[in-house]
């Protein structure tokens, strides 16, 4: 009887592991399955470079990692400037001190305006007047809507946790 239970447990764990692997693999390949989004992100990243935008962040910053993830494979084109000399609490790099960067991520534009926090690629494209076709705009809008839903979900979870702790 115990051998049967062990076999069932092993089988369940194996199936769960395979399912998890399939889901993660599908998420990583998602951009390849949507070439329109991939091209829109490529164009947006290049527009940011051409428009003189600067993306200040820190290697240890989770919001910076999320910002980069929004650009998928186009992340390598972003005008990224590393501000951290190490982990949290370490001094900023001189370029970020000179730029007076106070939070991460921070996007700075040639008109001396800035946006802080996770910003959708669509909002960044609009900020630098990037010319995108309607299909690209639609794909970036879907991505933005997903980002907003994720942020609202995170805020609701945090609010629920703080209420529970009170």
Predicted regions and their residues:
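N-terminal targeting signals for export/organelle localization
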Residues: 1-33, 166
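Structural microenvironment flanking redox-active thiols in thiol-disulfide oxidoreductases
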Residues: 47, 85-95
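Solvent-exposed loop/turn segments at secondary-structure junctions
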Residues: 59-64, 84-87, 102-103, 113-115, ...
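Non-catalytic, surface beta->alpha helical segment in thiol-disulfide oxidoreductase systems
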Residues: 108-151, 156, 160
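Structural recognition of the beta-strand scaffold that forms the well-ordered cores
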Residues: 54-57, 79-82, 106-108, 114
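Structural micro-motif
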Residues: 93-110
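Local sequence-structure signature of Cys/Sec-based thiol-disulfide redox active-site neighborhoods
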Residues: 33-79
């Amino acid at each position: 009887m115990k051998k049967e239970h062990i076999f069932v447990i092993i089988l369940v764990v194996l199936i769960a592991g395979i399912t998890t692997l399939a889901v993660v693999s599908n998420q990583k390949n998602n951009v390849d399955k949507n070439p329109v989004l991939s091209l829109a992100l490529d164009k947006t990243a290049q527009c940011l470079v051409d428009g003189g935008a600067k993306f200040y962040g820190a290697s240890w910053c989770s919001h910076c990692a999320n910002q980069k993830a929004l650009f998928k494979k186009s992340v390598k084109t972003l005008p990224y400037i590393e501000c951290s000399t190490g982990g949290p609490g370490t001094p900023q790099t001189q370029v970020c001190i000179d730029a007076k960067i106070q939070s991460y991520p921070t996007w700075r534009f040639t008109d001396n305006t800035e946006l802080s926090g996770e910003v959708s690629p669509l909002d960044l494209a609009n900020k630098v007047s990037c010319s995108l076709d309607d299909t690209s705009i639609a794909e970036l809008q879907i991505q933005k809507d997903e980002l907003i839903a994720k942020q609202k979900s995170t805020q609701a979870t945090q609010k629920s946790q703080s209420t529970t702790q009170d």
